């Protein structure tokens, strides 16, 4: 959110001024949305909310509270807007839209617009600040009932309906946000562990170790990819190098357990071999996953015991490698 706030403020200032000459207030102070099309990812298990904002430009010192009325404008959900998504400047948005043939409005019954102003649909740009925040709270059960929402096929179309005394920047008065989800364990993980290798008779013939090292070579780092609200795939097994294809599926249970299963097209038929679980730390960087599974390689059976340690994840174009929520450090 910190990164997005900086972008919002910079964009608003540039929209009403030329930055190299910006040494004082301009005659016109105006507000608007920085991005007319955007995609936001809701993280399953971390609270199904996100924030967007109305930014103020044209003044260094905002000397008053400004109430900006924001509403939903369904007329913005059209083919022209869809084309802006598919041809987006940000590659991660354009890539997400490749498999989305059209957009539709997210049903209003699934989400609420909240604000620290206490007034529904009102963003308040407080005195001394340049950003008014709108928080979108999504009903998790209703949203996740459609697993296809992994893609941003549905949008929330926002528009400033009244600046209440503050000018609105032409062309910046609206923002259409595609909404999708990611599982909380998606991303890149340092990998380590050991494997007991048994012969056809079930006798252990050797133990292979592959310790976790930080930093770790990229071809040893595992990638977990969201395939459903509570499902991910992993792109490696045991001590082998990773690849582009999924090698096993992880299904998360309500008790933080993980069920391991095979996936079509994988190198091995991976099966569970003992309990697997994830450690739900409040801090992103402290999360770990413990996996126990087996697979047959030639005439041998590999019994793998792995630990994954969180490295980073890319959410909405932002590299997240440690928790940014101050409350999680309390």
Model-predicted regions and their roles:
Residues 1-18:
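Sec-dependent bacterial lipoprotein signal peptides
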Residues 18-123, 133, 137-330:
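Intrinsically disordered, low-complexity regulatory regions in eukaryotic proteins
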Residues 129-130:
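Beta-strand-enriched, solvent-exposed domains that form extended recognition/catalytic surfaces
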